[in-house]
Amino acid sequence: MAAEREPPPLGDGKPTDFEELEDGEDLFTSTVSTLESSPSSPDPASFLAEDISTNSNGPKPAEVALDDDREDLFAEATEEVSLDSPEREPILSSETSPAVTPVTPTTLIAPRIESKSMSAPVIFDRSRDEIEEEANGDVFDIEIGVSDPEKVGDGMNAYMAYRVTTKTSLSMFSKSEFSVKRRFSDFLGLHSKLASKYLHVGYIVPPAPEKSIVGMTKVKVGKEDSSSTEFVEKRRAALERYLQRTVKHPTLLQDPDLRQFLESSELPRAVNTQALSGAGILRMVNKAADAVNKMTIKMNESDAWFEEKQQQFENQDQQLRKLHASVEALVCHRKELSANTAAFAKSAAMLGNSEDHTALSRALSQLAEVEEKIDQLHQEQAFADFYMFSELLSDYIRLIAAVKGVFDHRVKCWQKWEDAQITLLKKRETEAKMMVANKPDKIQQAKNEIREWEAKVQQGERDFEQISKTIRKEVGRFEKERVKDFKTVIIKYLESLVQTQQQLIKYWEAFLPEAKAIA
């Protein structure tokens, strides 16, 4: 009988649920009592761990056969108790007795997770962004403004000149503030120089505003009217945004042509910028040739990142164009609404003048005044729709075209490398034929050509790796700037919408007593 009451050997049996629960309760009670009996012990965590290890490794069968879940539960409780250090006192002091609640140990773990996720990552990300901006040279103390458009000359020889004002504390410039006069062709010439230097090596060069033959012809030969003034203002704002994006680029800012454009009082006349000149026609032919080459050259893309980004920019280009068309339609509808509101205000005023009833006549006159104010609000909102939102979309449609152009130059670089490899293979085949034909005079020439093309292959590989590395960096910088620009513009645009609606409410609330006063 005594042998039957002996515990089974280690691992040969399992305790009953009642025995397991009872031992588990004793185990946890011992832990709590240990904490309460020695609150001022120098190392409560180690003391508790020793207590638990003694109980769990003893000869008791129930403690040996504890399941994994219960051991993990106690381990978490032990881990939480070990956090009771001087650094964690403010967190644990807010709760009355966190260690006395063994049934819900997750309540002890949750504050620790929340405190980490709420404070550390935010501070780390912000400081990391600041460090990256400083390291990449994205923060520059330079302000660019384009103002004072002025018509110079008469007839078809006339052109618009703009004042470019620069304020900076950078040591590369001779003065802290200076301004120069530039015509539109000077901006196009600057972009052409920068693109020829940096586009083929992987740098994203912000595109200059496009020429408008119709708009500029109206400015040259026509009288000053609202359409001409609007065209000049659009171009001025576009030129200002172009320069601001250009000087934000750390590499382009160091370029001597850009510094000359900003500082020099006189610039050599920019040539080959006319749309209908020989150079303009040549550019159109080159674009057509590039389009054909793009269709014929198929690069076996081995980098998934480039393949993904190309698809991403294709989709963004399509969606931006759709949104831009929608915003332009919205601007047209707002202008139409403004015109109809003005017509309504005029009709209401005329009806009020012909009305014999005094109160009704006064109310109609007040209604006409309110509608005139609302007409002005619609004009201002259409202005905000265009200059805040539509122009941003238009800029980024051209910027994404520049990004896609950089990807095309990478394909050209790969094609050049591939052609060099094919030529090298042919040269080696020629050498083998010469050796078989036993022509020693031509063998040496073939070897020299092989060495030459081996160097070209190595150079092509280096160029391809370098442009790929540069594009990765440039795309990261571009996407960061894109998010910043869209965030800033969307906030300003929403603020303008809210302000417009609030002003509308004020106008109608002020008119409501007049309408109620009609008797």
Curated annotation (Swiss-Prot):
Q: What does this protein do?
A: Involved in several stages of intracellular trafficking. Interacts with membranes containing phosphatidylinositol 3-phosphate (PtdIns(3P)) or phosphatidylinositol 3,5-bisphosphate (PtdIns(3,5)P2). Acts in part as component of the retromer membrane-deforming SNX-BAR subcomplex. The SNX-BAR retromer mediates retrograde transport of cargo proteins from endosomes to the trans-Golgi network (TGN) and is involved in endosome-to-plasma membrane transport for cargo protein recycling.
Instruction: Return the protein name.
Output: Sorting nexin-2
Q: How does it assemble?
A: Predominantly forms heterodimers with BAR domain-containing sorting nexins SNX5, SNX6 and SNX32; can self-associate to form homodimers. The heterodimers are proposed to self-assemble into helical arrays on the membrane to stabilize and expand local membrane curvature underlying endosomal tubule formation.
Query: At what positions is Phosphothreonine found?
Result: T101, T104
Identify a single GO molecular function assigned to this protein: phosphatidylinositol binding
Q: Which Pfam families match?
A: PX, Sorting_nexin, Vps5
Q: Which residues does the UniProt record annotate as the domain PX?
A: 140-269
Q: Which residues carry this modification: Phosphoserine?
A: S97, S117, S119, S185, S277
Supply the source organism's classification.
Answer: Eukaryota, Metazoa, Chordata, Craniata, Vertebrata
Q: Which residues lie within the region annotated Disordered?
A: 1-20, 30-103
Q: Where is this region: Interaction with RhoG?
A: 260-519
TM helices/strands, residue ranges: none
Task: Please name the SUPFAM superfamilies in this protein's record.
Answer: BAR/IMD domain-like, PX domain
Q: Which GO terms describe its biological process?
A: early endosome to Golgi transport; intracellular protein transport; lamellipodium morphogenesis; retrograde transport, endosome to Golgi
PANTHER family xref list: SORTING NEXIN, SORTING NEXIN-2
Q: Output the Gene Ontology cellular-component terms.
A: cytosol; early endosome membrane; endosome; endosome membrane; lamellipodium; retromer complex
